[in-house]
Amino acid sequence: MVTIRLARGGAKKRPFYNIVVADSRNARDGRFIERVGFFNPVARGQEEALRLDLDRVDHWVANGAATTDRVAKLIKDARKAAA
């Protein structure tokens, strides 16, 4: 099953997440099909905290990709900010 989920990066105690489309059988930070954005939970000041390619997210969801709970919330926030 294809899922849209967070893949952790960054340093210890400084998380940074790539939002990726991946097969659910692959490891969290392993192989993925496409990177559709990023999420920086510790962004400060003018740093960009969230970027999502909503066209690609819509494409994958239309083709049956499931989203995790956290990614669904991030998509909702991105749509709200874009409107």
From Swiss-Prot:
Coiled coil: none annotated. GO terms for molecular function: structural constituent of ribosome. Signal peptide: none annotated. GO terms for cellular component: cytoplasm; small ribosomal subunit. Pfam families: Ribosomal_S16. Keywords: Ribonucleoprotein, Ribosomal protein. GO terms for biological process: translation. Gene3D superfamilies: 3.30.1320.10. PROSITE patterns: RIBOSOMAL_S16. Transmembrane segments: none annotated. Belongs to the bacterial ribosomal protein bS16 family. This is Small ribosomal subunit protein bS16. It comes from Shewanella loihica (strain ATCC BAA-1088 / PV-4).
